Regions:
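Short beta-strand element of the alpha/beta-hydrolase
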Residues: 49-57
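Alpha/beta-hydrolase active-site loop
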Residues: 94-114, 179
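Primarily recognizes the serine-hydrolase "nucleophile elbow" in alpha/beta-hydrolase
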Residues: 109-113, 119-163
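The serine-hydrolase catalytic nucleophile loop
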Residues: 58-71, 84, 93
Length: 250
């Protein structure tokens, strides 16, 4: 019973085409076969040595993030975005381990099939995707990690979003960004909207406090949970460019 409640609160897959890929040059591919997965992905090849491995948040799919893809294109950064099992046009059913496995498959595709140096990979995770990014970086070599609008762990965000459901405290402790950031050696850039009502900015401050090693925190004035790259404007874009260039090359 607890498992059913947990999944209903955690995973909200979306199959709607939001149109975010229609006007940008990209290739639509399938990845993950070596991991027993069938994942829909969008590949944006550019001239940079660095590459963004983009991990989107809950309630969305890869067609939702035009603003991010347009930013990466402006910065000349290659990007691989993919949908988790059960999201978008990817086969399967969502689960915590399934999300982690899909991220490993995407990294493997870049390293083993496209021959990218792992240190050229910049993980960019939004909201729930930040949890997948930090889990991957906790045991796999990458150049750097960028999170946007990411929470501390499943207990904290569950109690914040559903304070009227005390059962959340009895659910397994999952998506432990706080624990992962405490052990990740790769440089970290944490981005959070000042007005985020879904994940409070206090969680970003806590994550920054516990993060190990090189780390930066950017609180974007006037931004909510989903529009940091828009509200952040050129200043944020330049910070992202400088961070990825410094740690992953250009």
């Amino acid at each position: 019973m607890l498992s059913i409640i947990e999944k209903s609160l955690t995973f909200k897959p979306n199959q709607i085409d939001h149109g975010g890929l229609r006007t940008l040059e990209h290739e639509r591919i399938r990845i993950g076969a070596h991991f027993g997965l069938d994942l829909d992905a969008a590949w944006f090849p550019r001239k940079s040595k660095a590459i963004i491995l983009f991990l989107h948040g809950n309630r969305h799919n890869i067609t939702r993030f035009y603003d991010h893809y347009a930013l990466f294109e402006k910065l000349g950064l290659s990007c691989l975005a993919f949908d988790y099992p059960g999201y978008g046009e990817s086969a399967g059913t969502p689960s915590e381990q399934g999300l982690y496995a899909s991220a490993r498959a995407a990294r493997s595709f870049l390293v083993e099939q496209l021959n990218y140096d792992p240190m050229r990979i910049a993980l960019y995770g939004c909201s729930l995707g930040g949890s997948i990014a930090t889990e991957l970086a906790s045991h796999s070599e990458v150049g750097c990690v960028i999170t946007e609008s990411t929470f501390t762990n499943s207990h904290d965000i569950g109690q914040f979003l559903y304070p009227y459901l005390p059962i959340t405290r009895f659910l397994p402790l999952r998506f432990r960004n706080d624990a992962n950031l405490a052990i990740i050696k790769a440089p970290k850039l944490l981005i959070h909207g000042e007005l985020d009502e879904r994940v409070p900015v206090s969680m970003a401050n806590k994550l920054h406090d516990v993060a190990r090693g090189p780390k930066e925190l950017i609180i974007v004035p006037g931004a909510d949970h989903i529009n940091c790259v828009v509200k952040g404007g050129q200043e944020l874009h330049q910070r992202i460019a400088d961070f990825t260039t410094l740690h992953c090359g250009n």
